[in-house]
């Protein structure tokens, strides 16, 4: 590729905050706010017929999204490097929202399955930062310039490649934070208008949804190292049925060993194999887990649900010895009002 930036480029990252940062009371705005898309981060490199979808880890995702490669060649300029997110929207119950499950399924080794899924669940690309266009490297330009150049180069986009909405009004961003969750989005991102693009640096600010739930401990998995517990498996009651909803992980080495010793008395026999479909927390390569007696309740922090399951891995907060497992049901969960992805792209208008 003959582009101003060589493949790969590490994406600029975001640090977490609890609230949307406010604009100064006097003087011009310093922040630009955007919806936080919940997909696969990707930097698109296009040089004519050559297209690379660079992941956050530096891998090329192009083979998993052939329909997106063709869309990029049809809809984006001949020579461009643009940072953004790969998403899969799907219509459900009369509205279109982001579908993390369908997106996750796209990372598959079989070319035949990739082709089938490209037709069944086509992906879209949401661009939010222009790093280069033509022979110009724009990473040293302020974000306000890069944003304007992105709109000049791409327009609002479509039908498969879009530019994300943006505003400098913090009140609008706070409204987006609440409304757009119903379309499967993850929160809001704030960027300094005068900020240059700094790969692998946490220069942006992300504000994500945060919730807690009391869940039933139904089992655990051993850590991939073979030492201690890797994840705790969580369940909620749906009437009389106890359903697995996801897992909690990210324990220290010491805590993994402590948990294994603590839960050994609750163990019910040998490993079992989950007999449902593989998910992001239950891959096809690792479906064995150890069931335990239904006695313990865990309070966890989570962000969103995907149908009846956690969208992402939860974070362990504490044991709840005061709770009866039978009291842990779906009715405790907050359900956002549904919202359509097309309206998010249009800026909530």
Annotate each predicted stretch with a short phrase:
Residues 1-349:
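Catalytic cores of nucleic-acid ligases and guanylyltransferases
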């Amino acid at each position: 590729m003959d582009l101003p930036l060589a493949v790969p480029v590490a994406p600029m990252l975001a640090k977490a905050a609890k609230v949307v940062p406010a604009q100064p009371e006097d003087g011009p705005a310093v922040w630009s706010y955007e919806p936080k898309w919940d997909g696969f981060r990707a930097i698109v490199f296009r040089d004519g017929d050559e297209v690379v979808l660079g992941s956050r880890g530096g891998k090329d995702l192009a083979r998993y999204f052939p329909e997106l490669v063709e869309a990029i060649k049809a809809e984006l300029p001949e020579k461009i490097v643009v940072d953004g997110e790969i998403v899969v929207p799907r219509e459900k119950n009369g509205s279109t929202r982001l579908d993390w499950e369908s997106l996750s399924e796209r990372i598959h080794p079989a070319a035949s399955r990739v082709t089938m899924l490209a037709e069944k669940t086509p992906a879209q690309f949401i661009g939010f930062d222009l790093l280069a266009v033509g022979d110009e490297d724009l990473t040293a330009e302020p974000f306000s310039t890069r944003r304007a150049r992105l709109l000049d180069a791409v327009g609002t986009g479509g039908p498969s490649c879009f530019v994300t909405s943006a505003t400098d009004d913090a009140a609008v961003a706070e409204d987006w934070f609440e409304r757009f969750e119903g379309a499967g989005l993850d929160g809001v991102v704030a960027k300094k208008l005068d900020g240059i693009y700094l790969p692998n640096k946490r220069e942006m600010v992300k504000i994500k949804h945060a919730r807690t739930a009391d869940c039933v401990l139904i089992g655990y998995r051993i850590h991939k190292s073979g030492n201690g517990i890797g994840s705790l498996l969580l369940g909620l009651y749906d009437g009389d049925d106890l359903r697995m909803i996801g897992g909690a992980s990210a324990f220290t080495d010491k805590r993994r060993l402590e948990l294994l010793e603590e839960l050994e008395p609750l163990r019910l026999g040998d490993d079992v194999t989950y007999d449902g479909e593989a998910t992001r927390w239950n891959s096809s390569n690792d479906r064995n887990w150890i069931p335990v007696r239904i006695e313990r309740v865990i309070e966890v922090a989570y962000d969103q649900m995907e149908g009846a399951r956690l969208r992402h891995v939860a974070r362990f907060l504490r044991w709840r010895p005061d709770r009866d497992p039978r009291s842990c049901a779906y009715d405790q969960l907050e359900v956002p009002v549904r919202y359509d992805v097309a309206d998010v792209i249009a800026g909530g208008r």
